[in-house]
């Protein structure tokens, strides 16, 4: 099971009765703790009174490919926890089949990453520690086209519907320096997401 144990204050148990009824039905152990103890268990300034101990969920690239994905996000050297979590959440909202993190990316289970996914990390397959070159080659071999999200690429609206409808892995580079040149050599196409407002750039 995903949730191993819950730590909660008495106030939280009173505020979220449905949550703890479900925990009891699932035979999840609940430990009542004081406010100071709960605050020591979390790094947030104002914790909500409940801390869950959960299993870390890992997926294998082979399993992802075997499931014939239509949309995959591949994060290359992403270092900022907030950005990583936001991409996970956006990928989930877009109906992505998986998110793959390269071996030089931020820890997926960094507390800031987990919080910024707002739960998406628990129901979207995530592959961690992937070698970029090997992963791209494996995806290509499975018939998945590789697009790099790059400001200097072809404008997204210029791509045909047929092209966008094919199984695709979107590669996103580091926040500060973008892509390694050798990574761009492996992709099928560099694509720029247009910015219509006054924003200077997107996060990734």
Residue ranges and their predicted role:
Residues 1-204:
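Post-transcriptional modification and biogenesis factors for structured RNAs
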